[in-house]
Design a protein with these regions (language model features):
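Extracytoplasmic gate region of multi-pass secondary transporters
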Residues: 33-41, 225-286
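Extracytoplasmic
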Residues: 17-43, 48-52, 73, 160, ...
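Helix-to-loop junctions at the C-terminal end of transmembrane segments
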Residues: 69-81, 283-294, 381-382
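A late C-terminal transmembrane helix in Major Facilitator Superfamily
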Residues: 147, 156, 349-384
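Intracellular juxtamembrane helix-capping segments at the cytosolic ends
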Residues: 44, 122-136, 337-350
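Conserved MFS/SLC helix-loop-helix module at the cytosolic interface between two early adjacent transmembrane helices
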Residues: 68-106
Length: 417
């Protein structure tokens, strides 16, 4: 349907409820897997007497698990019982966080991270990208995904200060129990509300023509086998990897870095939560820009602004109270494209012929970046005593992202679908 509104054929359009459900899942599952890491770094490393790189290695295990899980479940979600996969995966992640809470040594975190990696992958971007692509067409898809994925930012803004207070007053083990409970809520909400396709509720996809609501295999574009033979595919995957390589370093190390810059523990946690709050604004902004000015412009703008964020971080030790504003604003606006742009880039560059498999490949690329970025930043800190070197490397990587995305859209002109 071309018309975009709250109702379709006289009934409230259920896709809007799914947008809110996605917001909740991102608020709890994404924040609970990734965004909260930095507030645990200091208390856990001090409790076990380990360096930051050793602790943050669990995030590498988590995200490498996510790469494998995405490869296995991407097609199964697109073609099979998506809701069942999400519910079971959320419960698996809850068990993982209970292992964290009961940890007797650092290797407990590595085992638990495998379970959390399953929940992180199967309860956040991958299923919601598939669901929202089924329910919403190109006229509104970017904005809808922006509102959905903004949950990770809003969730961080709300949850991070609360979690920091829990850790301060009751200990980090209690903090991990709270995260296990959050994944229990994810399972419950998913069981009640997730609906994979509009046809299951008697609707058609909103924001597209009737012809564009055909089955994915009948839509125009490339399948995964055709896509992997093009430079465009590998370049766009590289940009997704590089964006998350930098982002994961901020998520995992921001609070310790702000403390190194002279902020108190409470102020550092507050600024880290502001980072995530600004990310909420950025996701809505980038989604809106992609809808109104095109995915090309929105995705390139995202990479450029994100690079300015890393430059601000590199300059923070010189004047923390000034450059922190640039870091927070640019991280939020630029980082807003990290989850919003990849599914839109799949539509823009490869069409909908094999959307589920190609978006799964994009998800694998983002997870690969997350697997190494935060840990490498921690290792560089352990070696040099500073994060500045990493921030400079990340800023250079964002310049590469911009160039690669420009090239991809030039290559796209060769294809007629």
């Amino acid at each position: 349907m071309n018309k975009v509104g709250l109702k379709q054929n006289g009934r409230f359009y259920y896709g809007w409820i799914l947008m809110i459900v996605g917001f909740i899942l991102m608020s709890l599952a994404y924040t609970g897997s990734i965004s909260i890491t930095s507030v645990f770094v200091v208390p856990v490393t001090e409790a076990f007497g380990i360096d930051r790189g050793s602790f943050l290695l669990y995030q590498t295990v988590l995200t490498l698990t996510a790469v494998v899980v995405t490869a296995y479940f991407g097609k199964r979600m697109a073609k099979g019982r998506l809701k069942l996969i999400v519910v079971i995966s959320a419960l698996v992640a809850a068990v993982g966080y209970l292992l964290f809470a009961w940890a007797k040594a650092v290797y407990w975190f590595y085992f638990g991270a495998v379970l959390i990696g399953v929940g992180f992958t199967n309860c956040t971007v991958l299923p919601m990208s598939i669901i929202l692509n089924n329910w919403f067409g190109g006229k509104v898809r970017g904005t809808v995904m922006g509102f959905c994925f903004v949950g990770s930012g809003v969730g961080g803004l709300v949850i991070l200060p609360i979690l920091n207070s829990v850790i301060t007053n009751s200990g980090w083990r209690t903090g991990y129990i709270a995260l296990a409970c959050m994944f229990g809520i994810v399972a419950f909400v998913s069981l009640l509300f997730l609906v994979k396709t509009p046809q299951e509720r008697g609707f058609t996809r909103m924001g597209e023509t009737a012809e564009e609501t055909k089955a994915v295999e009948d839509a125009a574009g490339m399948n995964i086998k055709e896509a992997i033979k093009t430079p465009m595919f590998w370049l766009i995957l590289a940009t997704a990897t590089l964006m998350v390589f930098g982002s994961s370093a901020i998520l995992f190390n921001s609070a310790p870095f702000f403390i190194e810059c002279g902020f108190s523990t409470q102020k550092a946690a507050l600024v880290a939560s502001f980072n995530l709050g600004m990310l909420a604004v950025g996701k809505i902004f980038i989604g809106f820009i992609c809808d109104k000015l095109g995915t090309k412009f929105g995705s390139i703008l995202s990479g450029a602004i994100f690079g300015l964020g890393f430059l601000s971080l590199a300059l923070m030790p010189m004047n923390p109270n000034v450059f922190v504003f640039g870091a927070v604003i640019c991280y939020g606006i630029g980082g807003g494209g990290i989850t919003v742009c990849p599914p839109l880039l799949v539509n823009a560059l490869f069409g909908e012929k094999d959307y589920g498999n190609i978006v799964a490949a994009m998800n694998m690329a983002t997870n690969l970046g997350g697997a190494i970025g935060g840990t490498i930043a921690g290792v560089i800190y352990d070696i040099t005593g500073s994060y500045v070197v990493f921030w400079c490397i990340a800023a250079a990587m964002m310049a590469v992202v911009v160039v690669f995305r420009v090239i991809c859209f030039k290559l796209r002109k060769k294809y007629t679908y």
